[in-house]
Swiss-Prot record:
Gene Ontology CC annotations of this record: cytoplasm; ribonuclease P complex
Catalytic activity: Endonucleolytic cleavage of RNA, removing 5'-extranucleotides from tRNA precursor
Disulfide pattern: none
The protein's name: Ribonuclease P protein component 3
UniProt record, GO biological process: tRNA 5'-leader removal
Length: 214
């Protein structure tokens, strides 16, 4: 299969979403979502991730936290999974990039601005921290929120392009109803200002580079 035909879905968060995404994508990453402000039981988490790797192969952990220091704690552990951080809180956004996690997902989420600036973009580019552009929050938003989010995503994309930040476009689906195929995800990229080759690379080149870390 050629580079042009190969697509990767980097973030699906349920069994049913994974099974549907596998029909449309060549590789799919199963994401274990953790909402935490204290450290987990590490032995239990490692065992759960071991089982997920046996079942799904490629696995990520999505850390949702209000405690920036927890990001460094997770980064220091050898979890044998990609480490994503849910963006939104500016302190969390900054710490995710400083700690060199694999990806910061939707740094604008829940904000009245886009949660990302030239300083963070430059740091992300140097440290190889990808920005995840997620579709699912748009599906849950009202028309005003959707328009605002698209504007924020376009602003972040300008910085990602300028500073050569790794990135990917993903459904971030928590149910099968939120899964979308490569064509729809590419359309999202084009809608926020990507050229077609840039949107394609956000489903191919950049995801595959991240997967090489596993």
């Amino acid at each position: 299969m050629s580079e042009r035909e190969y697509f990767v879905e980097m973030d699906v968060r349920s069994v049913e979403a994974y099974e549907l995404a596998k029909e449309w994508f060549d590789e799919v990453v199963f994401t274990k979502k953790l909402i935490l402000d204290t450290e987990p039981d590490w032995d239990s988490l490692k065992e759960e991730l071991r089982e997920l790797r046996r079942t799904y192969g490629k696995v990520a952990v999505l850390l949702v936290t209000r405690k920036p220091s927890l990001i460094r704690t997770f980064k220091a552990r050898n979890l044998k999974a990609l480490l994503y951080v849910q963006g939104g809180d500016m302190r969390v956004n900054r710490m995710a990039i400083e700690a060199k996690v694999d990806a910061l997902i939707s740094p604008w989420l829940g904000r009245k601005d886009y949660g990302f600036d030239h300083t963070l973009a430059g740091m992300a580019g140097r440290r190889g921290v990808a920005i995840g552009f997620s579709l699912s929050p748009l599906l849950r938003a009202n028309p005003y929120e959707r328009a605002l989010t698209l504007r924020f995503m376009a602003k972040v994309w300008e910085l990602v392009r300028k500073y050569r930040v790794p990135r990917f476009i993903t459904s971030s689906a928590e149910s099968k109803w939120e899964v979308r195929g490569p064509r729809d995800l590419m359309s999202l990229g084009i809608n926020i200002g990507m050229e077609i080759p840039e949107a394609r690379a956000s489903l191919n080149f950049h995801p595959r580079s991240l997967l090489s870390r596993l």
